[in-house]
Regions:
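Elongated scaffold/linker segments in the mid-to-C-terminal portions of large proteins
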Residues: 23, 30-196, 205, 268-315
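Extended, hydrophobic/aromatic-rich amphipathic alpha-helical segments that build helical scaffolds
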Residues: 1-25, 53, 102, 186-220, ...
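C-terminal structured "cap/appendage" subdomains that terminate the fold
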Residues: 203-206, 213-279
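Helix-capping and short linker residues that terminate individual alpha-solenoid repeat units
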Residues: 28-31, 225-226
């Protein structure tokens, strides 16, 4: 039970989620489905049936172009090298949740790039991760690691720099021109995959592990070439809940869901503080109860007579 919500019935809300997600899956609100992985993040798939609500953008436009894709995917110069940003990604812990064959890391993670200056200054290139298939490809100089611009070799440092994370390709695959400061990468507020996982979670919370809930989970997994889960391996509601929570972290990474998921499950502080205060790039991750809420802007407190104090811990 999340503090402050003791009067809420989680079962009531799970029942509503189960019914509404079921209606969407059943086609009551139009035809939506889990599209082929390659289509979802392609230019032609930006308005496909999987995307229920997205922020639509326009390449190179000061008003309608978006900046977030540069942080997640980097901005390219005319030579095809990263010359700006590419600083927001997922940790190695996240990457290791996946099977190597899973499209969400095989295709959904940037595996090689060249940073202007930090790489070009020594004739090198960067890659991620430094194990498994991609490490073997680096050692064998298989494409794309046969790039003639990389004359001195490839480097990967997973433990001490914001330059080496599991950077997503979700947004770079769909944009028309990655050299633009403002791109046409659409931001997905709600995808059909989220609806299916909501249905799986709600079904489990109401009825425990059933074929219905595990099938929904597996629909998301197998679309990305991941191995399906076996119903027999889930002995109780808690075990399937953990699998669904993990799947949400995998499927919806960098789509703005994770913090809210951790808060609604009541494990935000536990999860964040398990990092030991710092992540690999020395970003402070220590959190206290005040971080469960954002601070109220000072201007709002001054102008709204109904607000006489800030949220706890933000005075």
């Amino acid at each position: 039970q999340v503090a402050g919500y003791e009067s809420f019935s989680s079962q009531e809300y799970y029942r509503l989620a189960y019914e509404i997600a079921g209606d969407i899956i059943g086609g009551e609100y139009g035809i939506h489905k889990l599209e082929d992985y390659d289509l979802v993040w392609s230019p032609s798939g930006k308005t496909c049936s999987e995307h229920l609500f997205s922020l639509q953008t326009k390449s190179g436009d000061e008003l309608y172009g978006t900046l977030f894709s540069s942080h997640y995917c980097g901005r390219l110069n005319a030579a095809g090298n990263i010359d700006n940003s590419l600083t927001v990604g997922c940790r190695k812990h996240w990457y290791l949740l996946f099977e190597e064959k899973d499209y969400r890391v095989d295709k959904g993670v940037l595996h090689c790039w060249i940073r202007q200056n930090s790489d070009t200054s020594w004739g090198g290139g960067s890659y991620y991760p430094n194990f498994g298939k991609w490490q073997r490809m680096v050692e064998a100089k298989e494409p794309p690691f046969d790039n003639p611009k990389v004359t001195s070799g490839w480097r990967c440092d997973e433990g001490g720099s914001e330059q080496f994370f599991a950077f997503t390709t979700k947004y770079s695959q769909q944009i028309a021109d990655q050299t633009q400061p403002r791109t046409d990468a659409n931001y997905p507020f709600l995808r059909y995959a989220d609806i299916v996982l909501i249905f799986a979670e709600a079904a489990n919370e109401l009825n425990g592990p059933t074929k219905e809930s595990v099938d929904a989970l597996n629909d998301v997994r197998t679309r990305s070439n991941a191995t399906g889960k076996e119903l027999a391996n889930f002995t109780d509601k808690t075990s399937l809940r953990s699998a669904i929570l993990e799947e949400r972290a995998m499927e919806l990474a960098l789509e703005g869901d994770r913090r809210w998921d951790l808060i609604r499950w009541g494990i935000y502080l536990q999860a964040m503080n398990a990092l030991g205060g710092m992540d690999e790039a020395n970003n402070v991750k220590q959190r206290s109860s005040k971080h469960l809420l954002f601070p109220i802007p000072t201007l709002e407190i001054l102008t709204n007579q109904g607000i006489n104090e800030n949220n706890p811990g933000w005075d």
